[in-house]
Amino acid sequence: KAIRRQRQMCIRDRSYTHAAENKTIRISTDNTDLVLQVGDNGRLYQTYLGERLLHEQDLNNFSWSIHAGADGSVSRRGWEVYSGSGNEDYFEPAIAITHNDGNPSTILYYVSSSSKAVEGGMETVINLRDDKYPVDVTLHYVAYPKENVIKTWSEIIHQEKKPVMLSTYASTMLYFNNSAYYLTEFSSDWAKEAQMSSQQLQFGKKVIDTKLGSRAAMHTHPFFEVGLDQPVREDQGSVLMGTLGWIGNFRFIFEVDNVGNLRVIPGINPYASNYELKPNEVFTTPEFIFTLSNDGAGKGSRNLHEWARNYSLKDGKGSRLTLLNNWENTGFNFNQEILTELMKEAKHLGVDMFLLDDGWFANKYPRKNDHAGLGDWDVNHNKLPGGIPALVKAAKDADVKFGIWIEPEMVNPKSELFEKHPDWAIMLPNRDTYYYRNQLVLDLSNPKVQDYVYSVVENIMKENPEVAFFKWDCNSPITNIYSPYLKNKQGQLYIDHVRGIYNVLKRVKENYPDVPMMLCSGGGARCDYEALKYFTEFWCSDNTDPVERIYIQWGFSQFFPAKAMDAHVTSWNKATSVKFRTDVASMCKLGFDIGLKELTADELAYCQTAVANWKRLQNAIMDGDQYRLVSPYEGNHMALNYVSKDTNKAVLFAYDIHPRFQEKLMAVKLQGLDPNKQYKVCLLYTSDAADE
């Protein structure tokens, strides 16, 4: 009886809150609605997030007052859109500020909202304000109807007399009321990126975060999936897929409350990052990008892929360059003659470009290994007496483009740069210094360091305007966390350092908009959509073993289109055939890092044919819709297919991962084809030496 009375009271209270003054804000895609409402208390609440409502009047069926629990303090509180610390809520807030008088509370009230058309969608801007302190928060939501993607971020500003201290600053908050929640996360390590694992979320908090600073995603990636009511499945069920556009420390909080509702709170990790915000200074959070798919993760991935190509990825609609890299051919040991021969091999292979990797720079402390030279970006004259201009000319003579590797955010203590500017490195005073890969991270919170890092690209391009590509690496997390530049504001280092990186990348893009760049971080430890505004692609992993790459590429494909993912044919796992290695790399942006002279005539011919076919099929693989058909996590096989936008062409990749005992192979049913068309099926990649 008590339960029945409580339910009746809920119904009466909900009808009461549907007063005319309870302004409703609807943020819509073609498939999803996010509905917000101003409560009777003047604060803003989420009332609905789910499948798009069919009728406008359906909005009247939702109320801000959700009766979150039996405890009186929260029984009339709803799902506050940007909850502040110190209010009547018992759960994790989105924002925490310590004001000039020491008060640690922030309560935000609705002020106004507006909407405007932007490229590809509609932006809704909502203004909130604390009624006791001069603090304003602006919430931004950009809805992309066709792609079913919503991008959201927040801006914080105040007009107090002195700086306030920000200790929490989430990008947004989302709420769900389902019977169960199943989280898929993506763990990582060197050569072990994007490993998927799932668990059911129970009462309490699950936190995914990183504290590594620059190479931030080395152990976990900034994206996740949440299955609603059931575990995440490929082709059916409701799934939230979210990713944060931030190259630095991030944090995802998943909090299941006392009545089984889920709060999802993405943002910068506030670890060691109490941020002193000056009056009238705007603190902008990273963008959180999400899609809510009712047709499984496969549809959610296609949503994100299309959105990325259209609106986020640099040159998202352009073609990509196939290449030959010298790293596994030569390591640090090369000269001008060796590189010139490799350029000729690149042309013979049929790729578009030769990419020169690490080891081309530094004179006083030559880059003979990874112990010296980082920071000194003048060409090593013993190795390359003609400098970069001679290499660009040699590439042009070979009829291939020329690209080059840089790692401008780093410095070796054994370098001229460190001798001149030791205060430019992030390094603790009065402590033993810890080196990761024999190097330190430059302090990009310092504007002078930003100028220097930008000059690395500028100097190369001024001398060699025909350089066609940069591979931008970052091999170290931040160690010895201390900024000589920030002095007594060390809580800002993790954030201002990342903002400094973005400042440099913006300058590079503004001045060299047509130069493609690969984002690399000791493999795939950098893979976010803010960085990919400035990079055409990213290096998924140093692990190019085709068996392991199947899993790595499967994981990254959940959030990134194939044209953003680099995959190279190398000598890793020589027990597998060259064909197998080439086929796996062909699922993404194809490249080679292998000695062509090591190949047999048949293997070389196969690679040449594969390059030609990949170029011919690039519009389907790079720009088509991807359908993941058979998961390597569920057995000994893997299959996926791409379908061109006009559905006239499709490409199927299917693998027997560990062939044993002539095991039975199962038929694969393709997806995405037009049932009203007839297709001719051709086996493109054949080889007598095939082992899959």
Model-derived regions, located:
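Single conserved hydrophobic/aromatic residue that forms the stacking wall/gate
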Residues: 1-7, 11, 685-692
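Polysaccharide-binding surfaces and accessory modules of carbohydrate-active proteins
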Residues: 16-28, 32-35, 44-255, 271, ...
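Carbohydrate-binding surface patches
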Residues: 31, 224-226, 234, 631-674
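Conserved, mostly hydrophobic/aromatic
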Residues: 31, 154, 280, 395, ...
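Short Pro-Gly-centered flexible turn/kink motifs
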Residues: 106-107, 275-294
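Aromatic-lined carbohydrate-binding/catalytic grooves of carbohydrate-active enzymes
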Residues: 317-394, 398-455
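Active-site neighborhood of glycoside hydrolase catalytic domains
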Residues: 430-569, 598
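Catalytic cores of secreted or luminal carbohydrate-active enzymes
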Residues: 583-626
